[in-house]
Amino acid sequence: MEAQDTTELMEQKAHGDKNQNRSALTISILAMVLAIASLGGSNAMKEATQENILAANAYAFYQAKNIRQTSFKLAAADLELQLAREPNMNATAKAMFEKKIEDYKKTADRYESEPENKEGKKELMARAKAHEATRDHAMQQDPWFDYAEGALQIAIVLLSVSIVASMPVLYWAGTVLGTMGFVSTVNGYFLFF
């Protein structure tokens, strides 16, 4: 073996080490991005599930209020009908009927909106819609994290193989997929598109 051959082998080895180091560093960065994407996807699904439950609870409470409100309206209407059927009712009984009708109507009206405790139908509907909006946002985020995880996992495999096989094309393919995974991760958090 001549000195020139030895020098060429050393240069090839140094170039190979440089490519391996670059691939290893890229794998490390992509593994970190993969962990962040996985965390984001997990949190998005938890949030979507939680907000869906809260929206369902708010709608159920709304329906219960609506049923109670309807019951009071029906009771008031029934008492009004009884009052109309009995024009000769004594004054005390008539006053009691009118008082009860007024109470029922006030309660039914109060159920429409209760800003003091935020449990009126209007407030419950607004709360349910807000939970739905948050749920929908989380549902829009989740697929981006899934895309990111897939792209990043494949990129890491390609980069690992590029080290073993010393194939630059695999490094570049892994880098492109890794970049796509990174962009998908960022979009999962911020929903740019």
How would you label these PLM feature ranges?
Residues G16-A24, R135, M139-A148, M167-L170:
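Membrane-interface helix-boundary signature
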Residues E112-R127, D142-P143, P168, G174, ...:
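Ligand-binding pocket scaffold of soluble enzyme catalytic domains
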Residues I29, I36-S38, E98, E102, ...:
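Terminal, low-complexity, charged helical segments
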Residues M1-T26:
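N-terminal positive-inside, membrane-proximal cytosolic segments immediately preceding the first
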Residues L34-N57:
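Transmembrane signal-anchor/signal-peptide helices with a preference for the extracytoplasmic
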Residues A126-L152, L158-I163:
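Short, aromatic-rich amphipathic segments at membrane interfaces
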Residues N57-H131:
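Long, solvent-exposed extracytoplasmic domains/loops
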Residues R22, G150, I154-F193:
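Juxtamembrane interface at the cytosolic side of transmembrane helices
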